[in-house]
Each structure stands twice: as structure tokens, then as C-alpha cells.
């Protein structure tokens, strides 16, 4: 199997065997780092990190992973990148491709990262777009594999909340590609697009995955091993949108009751972070004062419980991103 010089844009581009190879490599690299026997396989390589959207986990994961492996990075922050403003995506790709061995892009439309990949001449990695979040999916799959105690194709998980964007889309495709029992619990107006659902069903035909989309949150989580969620509203959206979304999604909040509805005492909670789970941030306090909610998509009780594996998930961003880069660029 050859992952050398491969772009990493979306899971739809990969076979189940290739996705599993990334997970196996990530597990090896993680074990090597923990044991203090990591071998640098990217010495002399340079990677450009284009961030049109800010990030804590993605940036730190790419930077630490690259440095662990002996590579250099250049961080292009949102205010520094001219991409699409003074310089076209096509030209930016060709310039950076002459200077760097790979390019990471985190930003808006999937079409941007696809165009970068078309013209860069070097591997391009998707750090997040509106449509897909493939590096997060490797982290999620590795975390589920570590905590499940059984093969992924015998594992069930649910995503509850707003499923229209990168997390809902990507988790549906991940489950389909890896032969999992994947459920989406959301109001139908917040389901992934018909195109994504069709792609998931097509992948499931090959892998034997089971796909369920339901408006009933309790039905979605019945007998699952993992319950995933994400934020309901993006920062910068008006107060009216927050109120509307909170009203629409209140039954999909991850509470002790929803966890119990799984019927699985070992069920685990997952979240890509950041999460609105208490009043300890300015946003959290504003939400409490405005809507009377202490925590939005998940309660503090669940977030801080032994069932929560969100920080294992966050750590695994780094190990899985390292696997993507080593597979593409490693000696």
C-alpha cells in the first residue's frame, strides 16, 4: 500500500485499508514517542501551515508532530495569508509548492484545499474545511479503537446535534468506510446533505457498515459504545440564531439521561473541542446569562465524568496528524 506523497483531503479519497494503515502507523508512532524511541523520518522537510481559521489543537498538533519528526514549519496566520485576496489559490499553491515539501490548509470551502492540491505539486493536508475534517476523523477512530476493546467494525457510535457540517459529514463517512454502526441523531433539517448520505451508503455497501439517521436522540444512542457531539452555534452568529438552534437541539444535549439511554454502562463521550460545557469562559458565561444554560451541547457533569475521553481524543490529533505526514513525506 503506497501512501507516499498522497494528499489528505477527505476520507472519501481512501480505501478502508488505507485508513486503517494510517491508524496503525499513528499507534506505532504514539507508542514510540511514549517509550522515548521515536525515529525522525522527516529531517530536512519543510511544511507550510495555512490557517484561514484560527485553531489551537490543529496548529499545535501539526507543529509538535513535525518537530518530533525533524521537520520545520511555517505558520501563516489568517491575517498573513494572501490566498484568494491578492493572490489566487492557484498561484499560492505553485509558489508554496516550490518552497515547501507539503502544505496544510485550514479554512473555509473544500474547493480551496482541492485546488491547492491540484496545483501545488506537493502533498496537501486538510486541517479542516466547512465540509470535512479528516485529520479529526483519524484521531476519533484511533481513540475509539483504544477505548472500545473490540474491532472498529464491531463498534457503534452516534453523533447528536447539528450534523450539516464537517463533523457530521466526516463521522458519517468514517463509520461507513470502516464498516461501523454509525447513527446521526438530529432534526432532519440539520442532517448531512443528500450527497454525503448517498456517499456514505455507497461506502457502506462495500464495508457492511450500518447507517441510521433519526430525529430521535434516544433511538440514535441505543446500544452505542460512543456518543459524539460538537458545538451547536459558531461564534459570530447573531443571538437570534443561538436561541433558534438551542430550541431546535435541546433534546440532543448530552446529559446523564442521554448517556443512560444508550443502555451501555461503559458508553464514552467524545467531542472535537472546544466545548461549551460550563460558565468558565466569557462565551460560557454569556450563554448562561442570555439563555440560562450552564453548558450547551453537553453538561459539565458529563464533560468532567470518567465517561469523557475528550482529552485522549485531543492528544490523538497529534499522533494521527504525524502519521499522515510521515506516510506522505517520511524517509
From Swiss-Prot:
Pathway: Amino-acid biosynthesis; L-arginine biosynthesis; L-arginine from L-ornithine and carbamoyl phosphate: step 1/3
Gene3D superfamilies per UniProt: Aspartate/ornithine carbamoyltransferase (3.40.50.1370)
MF annotations from Gene Ontology: amino acid binding; ornithine carbamoyltransferase activity
Catalytic activity line of the entry: carbamoyl phosphate + L-ornithine = L-citrulline + phosphate + H(+)
Pfam family membership, one: OTCace_N
Entry's Gene Ontology BP terms: arginine biosynthetic process via ornithine; citrulline biosynthetic process; L-arginine biosynthetic process
GO CC aspect terms: cytoplasm
Enzyme category, top tier: transferase
Function: Reversibly catalyzes the transfer of the carbamoyl group from carbamoyl phosphate (CP) to the N(epsilon) atom of ornithine (ORN) to produce L-citrulline.
HAMAP family for the chain: OTCase
Protein name (database record): Ornithine carbamoyltransferase
Native source species: Neisseria meningitidis serogroup B (strain ATCC BAA-335 / MC58)
Amino acid at each position: 500500500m503506497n501512501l507516499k506523497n498522497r494528499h489528505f483531503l477527505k476520507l472519501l479519497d481512501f480505501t478502508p485499508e488505507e485508513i486503517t494503515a494510517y491508524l496503525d502507523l499513528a499507534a506505532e508512532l504514539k507508542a514510540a514517542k511514549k517509550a522515548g524511541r521515536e525515529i525522525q523520518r522527516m529531517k530536512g522537510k519543510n511544511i507550510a501551515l495555512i490557517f484561514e481559521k484560527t485553531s489551537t489543537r490543529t496548529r499545535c498538533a501539526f507543529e509538535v508532530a513535525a518537530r518530533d519528526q525533524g521537520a520545520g514549519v511555517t505558520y501563516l496566520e489568517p491575517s498573513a495569508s494572501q490566498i484568494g485576496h491578492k493572490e489566487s489559490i492557484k498561484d499560492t499553491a505553485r509558489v508554496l509548492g516550490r518552497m515547501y515539501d507539503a502544505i496544510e490548509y485550514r479554512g473555509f470551502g473544500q474547493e480551496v484545499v482541492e485546488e491547492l492540491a491540484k496545483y501545488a505539486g506537493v502533498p496537501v493536508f486538510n486541517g479542516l474545511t466547512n465540509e470535512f475534517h479528516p485529520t479529526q476523523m483519524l484521531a476519533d477512530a484511533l481513540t475509539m479503537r483504544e477505548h472500545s476493546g473490540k474491532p472498529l467494525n464491531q463498534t457503534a457510535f452516534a453523533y447528536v446535534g447539528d450534523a450539516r457540517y464537517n463533523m457530521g459529514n466526516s463521522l458519517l463517512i468514517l463509520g461507513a468506510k470502516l464498516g461501523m454502526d454509525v447513527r446521526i441523531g438530529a432534526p432532519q433539517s440539520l442532517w448531512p446533505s443528500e450527497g454525503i448520505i448517498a456517499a456514505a451508503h455507497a461506502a457502506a455497501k462495500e464495508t457492511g457498515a450500518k447507517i441510521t439517521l433519526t430525529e430521535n436522540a434516544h433511538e440514535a444512542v441505543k446500544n452505542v459504545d460512543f456518543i459524539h457531539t460538537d458545538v451547536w452555534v459558531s461564534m459570530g452568529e447573531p443571538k437570534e440564531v443561538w436561541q433558534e438552534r438551542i430550541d431546535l437541539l435541546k433534546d440532543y444535549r448530552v446529559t446523564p439521561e442521554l448517556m443512560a439511554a444508550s443502555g451501555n454502562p461503559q458508553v464514552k463521550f467524545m467531542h472535537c473541542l472546544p466545548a461549551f460545557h460550563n460558565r468558565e469562559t466569557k462565551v460560557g458565561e454569556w450563554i448562561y446569562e442570555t439563555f440560562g444554560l450552564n453548558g450547551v451541547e453537553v453538561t459539565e457533569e458529563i464533560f468532567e465524568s470518567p465517561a469523557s475521553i475528550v482529552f485522549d481524543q485531543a492528544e490523538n490529533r497529534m499522533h494521527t496528524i504525524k502519521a499522515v505526514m510521515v506516510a506522505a513525506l517520511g524517509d
